[in-house]
Regions:
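Extracytoplasmic mature domains of secreted or surface-exposed proteins
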Residues: 1-413
Length: 413
């Protein structure tokens, strides 16, 4: 039953009118992990829990109460891309027609996995017409004395149902003499067929080893890819956040930023990106003097600096921990930016979320002086509900070493 708050809550605090005092307490105890959430029709929320080698899909009403009419049985759809094979969810996308696309990976190896996509009908049953798409390994066979690692895939669904699917691989030799990291970009039509004209695009930010973390589309249908490059300097890893822009046909848009690419001036890594209206907004983490900072940037559609955002400079927020992992970025209707993730301090992993104004200033009216350090746990995904403006997170609560409990969190905006 939905709980109701007696007094209004401050922005950034749990919204006690959502679910049970701000939390959807997902059945299954400590045996699952909430990996992704998306807003569905009528403001409902569909979320995916990774539990027992399956993807468990559930739906809640807009206020967080259960929706028993969703799914194949008792409000749940259990899914594996391949029978008796570990299926890990990464991202859930909602189509304009109400259907749902689940992006994830399949395989018995925790590091070398195949990218997989499937589609569900609006009621949560599998879309048998779409079926499932499982991509081959990007390097096959793997050369002797080498290891192949595949990152978690991500995607974007267009209004006409086309899917942009980003993945990649890291190939390295056992003796350390060879390392190659490449991002890959694919496109599928609304029926799930590969766009052969688009093909498979290799993404190498400025020609360097690269990893994709987000993909989105500008209003003119140009494709923006966000991630990180690693330009080794004197034998040392030197990662930095980067963007690439492509035409709708998949060709590099050399009018964007500098010859099609943008990269951070300083050491930075991890992060997420979202296109909002005609702006490219992204977060990353930086380490300055041994302290972890969250970095937030906003660019114009041509890749140039947006001088209306913090005078064109990166917003740097000291989180006073060694390591910061931004996992989600979402933009409210008032153009305020919500960034969330987790921090790590030796033996403690803590959820955080914060808000930056449209002008690029930490919103001190949000949570505690702009930042909420909520509880120990892990955060995977976040969105803003369109009608209510409520902020929603997919997260697990519990200590770094010990039982964690999967949740969907509702936060006052």
């Amino acid at each position: 039953m939905t709980a109701r708050a007696d007094t209004p809550k401050k922005a950034g605090e749990l919204d006690e009118s959502f679910a049970e005092m701000g939390l959807i307490n997902i059945p299954g105890g400590s045996h699952g992990s909430t990996r992704c959430v998306v807003e569905h029709s009528q403001g409902k929320l569909v979320y995916v829990v990774y539990q027992g080698r399956f993807c468990w899909l559930r739906r809640a009403m807009a206020d967080g109460s259960p929706d028993p009419e969703f799914g194949e049985k008792e409000g749940v759809t259990k899914w594996q891309f391949e029978a008796n094979t570990d299926a890990r969810p990464t991202q859930l996308l909602a189509q304009a027609d109400g259907k749902l696309l689940l992006i994830g990976s399949t395989g018995s190896d925790p590091f070398m996995r195949r990218v997989a996509v499937t589609r569900f009908n609006e009621n949560g049953t599998p879309d048998l017409i779409f079926g499932k798409k499982i991509l081959p390994f990007p390097v096959d066979p793997v050369p002797p004395d080498h290891a192949l690692t595949t990152p978690a895939p991500v995607g974007y669904i267009s209004a006409d149902g086309q899917l942009l699917l980003a993945s990649g691989y890291l190939l390295s030799s056992f003796d350390g003499s060879f390392l190659e990291e490449v991002g890959l970009l694919h496109r599928f039509d609304a029926s799930g067929k590969p766009d052969l004209d688009f093909g498979t695009r290799e993404v190498r930010f400025n020609g360097d080893n690269s990893k994709i973390q987000s993909v989105d589309v500008l209003p003119d249908n140009r494709i923006v890819v966000f991630g990180s490059l690693d330009r080794v300097d004197q034998g040392q890893s030197n990662p930095r956040s980067a963007l690439a822009c492509y035409t709708p046909k998949g060709e590099l848009d050399r009018a964007f930023a500098t010859d099609g690419y943008w990269e951070a001036d300083d050491y930075s890594r991890h992060g997420q990106m979202q296109v909002h209206e005609d702006k490219v907004i992204f977060s990353s983490s930086r380490t300055i003097g041994g302290v972890g900072y969250l970095a937030v940037n906003r660019l114009l559609a041509d890749g140039s600096v947006d001088f209306s955002f913090n005078s064109g400079k990166t917003v740097l927020i000291n989180l006073d921990v060694p390591s910061v992992f931004p996992m989600s970025i979402a933009v409210q209707s008032d153009r305020k930016i919500v960034v969330a993730g987790y921090t790590f301090n030796g033996d403690q992993q803590t959820l955080f979320w914060l808000r930056v104004s449209e002008a690029g200033v930490l919103d001190k009216d949000f949570a505690e002086q702009g930042i909420s350090r909520h509880a120990e746990g892990y955060l995977s995904d976040g969105i803003v509900q369109r009608e209510s403006g409520r902020i929603i997170f997919a997260a697990d609560l519990g200590p770094y070493i010990g039982e964690k409990h999967p949740k969907v969190i509702g936060v006052q905006s």
